């Protein structure tokens, strides 16, 4: 009978297919730096009391650490400190920049809510806000259109003083 074909189990077919068409990556390739990346983290909150003991001038700022190899960023690593009011101003500037670019595909989420309670400087409240700002920053900085085209994002992440 000339119509008979040799039987191959799925396992042997799969093995043949992968060995012929796919190279198994080496350990250094698996753990190498990705082609394009932006890592960002909001951490290390610090509460400042500029008038000594008087709480009226107290504020908390947060450290933003960024590591990237994206070509439109000026620094490969940056570390800045920002207050909540800086995040508010950044969001406002970002919305203005997006409207000028006329790009409806970029939606900037709302910031975590402002805290008006008397315990706003408690460790628990500050940590909750830090986590919220970290999530917010991950979303905003993670947007591919903002990564590749927002000068406002770059200034907020890299400049010591953010002026918009």
Swiss-Prot record:
- State the membrane topology: Peripheral membrane protein
* GO MF entries: phosphatidylinositol-3-phosphate binding
What residues bind a 1,2-diacyl-sn-glycero-3-phospho-(1D-myo-inositol-3-phosphate), as annotated?
83, 85, 114, 120, 129
The compartments listed are: Cytoplasm; Golgi apparatus membrane; Prevacuolar compartment membrane
Q: Which GO terms describe its cellular component?
A: cytosol; early endosome membrane; Golgi membrane; protein-lipid complex; retromer complex
- Which SMART domains does its entry note? PX
Q: Which InterPro entries is this protein grouped with? A: PX_dom, PX_dom_sf, Sorting_Nexin
Q: Which UniProt keywords apply?
A: Cytoplasm, Golgi apparatus, Lipid-binding, Membrane, Protein transport, Transport
PROSITE patterns in the record: PX
What are the start and end residues of every segment in region (Disordered)?
1-26
Q: Where is the composition biased (Polar residues)?
A: 10-26
Q: Which GO terms describe its biological process?
A: endocytic recycling; late endosome to Golgi transport; protein transport
SUPFAM superfamilies the UniProt entry points to = PX domain (SSF64268)
Q: Which domain of life is it from?
A: Eukaryota
**Residue ranges constituting the PX domain according to the UniProt record:** 40-163
Biological role: Required for retention of late Golgi membrane proteins. Component of the retrieval machinery that functions by direct interaction with the cytosolic tails of certain TGN membrane proteins during the sorting/budding process at the prevacuolar compartment. Binds phosphatidylinositol 3-phosphate (PtdIns(P3)).
Write out the similarity annotation: Belongs to the sorting nexin family.
Domain characteristics, as noted in the entry: The PX domain binds phosphatidylinositol 3-phosphate which is necessary for peripheral membrane localization.
What is the protein's name according to its record? Answer: Sorting nexin-3
* UniProt organism field: Candida glabrata (strain ATCC 2001 / BCRC 20586 / JCM 3761 / NBRC 0622 / NRRL Y-65 / CBS 138) (Yeast)
Q: In the record, what lineage is assigned to the organism producing the protein?
A: Eukaryota, Fungi, Dikarya, Ascomycota, Saccharomycotina
**Gene name as annotated:** SNX3
């Amino acid at each position: 009978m000339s119509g008979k074909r040799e039987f191959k189990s799925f396992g042997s077919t799969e093995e043949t297919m992968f060995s012929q068409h796919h190279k198994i990556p080496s350990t250094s390739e698996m753990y190498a730096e990705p082609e394009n990346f932006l890592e960002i983290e909001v951490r290390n909150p610090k509460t400042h009391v500029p008038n000594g003991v008087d709480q009226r001038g107290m504020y908390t700022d947060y450290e933003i650490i960024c590591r990237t190899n994206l070509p439109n960023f000026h620094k490969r690593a940056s570390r800045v400190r920002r207050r909540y009011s800086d995040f508010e101003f950044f969001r406002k500037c970002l919305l203005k920049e997006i409207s000028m670019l006329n790009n409806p595909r970029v939606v900037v989420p709302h910031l975590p809510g402002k805290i008006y309670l008397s315990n706003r400087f408690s460790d628990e409240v500050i940590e909750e806000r830090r986590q919220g700002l970290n999530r917010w920053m991950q979303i905003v900085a993670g947007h591919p259109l903002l990564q590749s085209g927002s000068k406002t994002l770059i200034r907020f992440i890299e400049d010591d003083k953010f002026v918009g």
